[in-house]
Amino acid sequence: MSNGSNDWGVSYSRIAWLEDAIQNHDNVVNYNRHDDIIMEFDRRDGSSIVLICLDEYALGEAAVHRVLKEFPTVNYISVGGNWNGYTEEAKQLCLSKNIGLFNSSELTGALWKDEFWAYHQRDKDGNPIYPYKKERAA
């Protein structure tokens, strides 16, 4: 475990916040962190999650491909706080690969779902809502 730097520019405060949220979640057991931003844990049903902690305002499809190239076992991508999100294309790519893609507002609900990658919040009428963002021009 490191509290140093990582190639994704994720600050220690972002990592520490997510680490605390995961370790204190009632459905999480056997927690371990490595490579600074990778969190591995089991859920009470025995299923395993390999989560990458990011801090991306608008995570796009290219970044999902980068995650999977660098960390092929990742099955949960956390993009950061409530103000962060992802593009619709990134979400569709993750859904097609059974990979969870969420910001912090979606975190706790997803960890309770058997098919966590398919979790979504709903509006007052029961429609799915997602924190979609437009990718910033590079």
What are these regions, as identified by a protein language model?
Residues 33-38, 47-52, 121-138:
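Phospho-regulatory, Ser/Thr- and acidic-rich intrinsically disordered linkers and terminal tails
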Residues 1-37:
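Acidic-basic catalytic patches of nuclease active cores, encompassing PD-(D/E)XK
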Residues 79-85, 105-110:
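Short beta-alpha junction loops
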Residues 38-42, 89, 113:
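Short, solvent-exposed polar/charged micro-motifs at secondary-structure junctions
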Residues 87-97:
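Short, aromatic/basic amphipathic alpha-helical patches
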Residues 96-128:
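Charged, structured surface patches that assemble and position nucleic-acid processing machinery
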Residues 59-65, 87, 131-133, 137:
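A diffuse structural propensity rather than consistent per-protein peaks
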Residues 39-67, 71-80:
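Conserved catalytic cores of phosphodiester-cleaving nucleases, focusing on short active-site segments
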